[in-house]
Amino acid sequence: QEPGDFMSLTFSAVLFDVDGTIVNSAPVIMGAFRSTLSDFGLEIPDDQRLRTYVGPPLWYSFGDLGYSGQLRADLVSRYRERYMDHYLDPEPFDGVRDLLWDLHHAGVPLATATSKQTPMAIAQMEHLGLADAFDVIAGATPDPGSSKTTVIHEAIARLGAMGADVSHPVIVGDSIWDVRGGHEAGIPVIGVGWGYATEDGLDDAEIVCETVEDLRALLMPAGC
C-alpha cells in the first residue's frame, strides 16, 4: 500500500504487537503447539497452518483446531506450560530494538498490546532489555474473553492514566488480529511485512511497512 496522506499524520502514542512484530517467535510458538498436541495424542497440523496461530489468542487457536469445552481449556493450560520453557528465546527482528529506543528517547509514548499474558510480556521485555523503552506493557489475561481489542483498550487507558496524549494512537502489528483489534478499538493500524501475516491478512491495515526503516520514517517525530 502507498503511504498517501497517512504519511502526514502524527501519532500521539504507539502500541506494538510483540510476536511477529518485535520478536521472531514463530519457532517457539509452533514448537509449543506441537508439544501440547503431542502430549494429548492429538493430530499435529502442518507448519503452514501452525504459523497462522502465531499471534491469535490461544482460545481461538485451539477452537479453530476443532477443540472445545474442557479439552480446549486443558490444551490452553498445557500450552502455557510448554511455552514457559522457551518463551524468552526469541530475539528482536533486525532494527526493531533501535527503533523502539529511538522512539522512546524522542518522547513518543509506547505500549505493548500482545495476546500473551502480561507477566510473560513483562518478563520478555525485561529479558530483552526493552522494558524501560515502554511506558506500558499490556498483555492478555487468562480469561477466555481477553482479546486483542481488550488489550488495546487497556494499553490506551493505562497510557492515558499516566498523562500520555492518547488522542491519536496507532497500533503496529503483523497479523489480521492486530488489524481487527485496532479497528474494533477505533484506532488505525500499521501493518508490518516482516511478520507472519497470511497473504491477505494486512489488506485492511491503513498502511503496510515492508521494512523497519519504512516504519521509522512513519513514526519518528519531525526533527528527530
Task: Locate predicted features.
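A generic alpha-helix signature
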Residues: 28, 74, 114-116, 147-150
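Hydrophobic residues in well-ordered beta-strands that form the structural core
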Residues: 24, 46, 112-114, 191
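Short, surface-exposed loop/turn motifs that are enriched in glycine and acidic residues
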Residues: 86, 110, 141-142
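Asp-based, Mg2+/Mn2+-dependent phosphohydrolase catalytic module
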Residues: 3-12, 101-104, 118, 122-224
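Short loop/edge segments at beta-strand edges and connector loops
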Residues: 94, 114, 210
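Residue-level detector of anion-binding/catalytic polar loops
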Residues: 43, 109, 188
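N-terminal helical cap/lid subdomain that shapes the substrate entry/recognition surface
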Residues: 9-106, 119
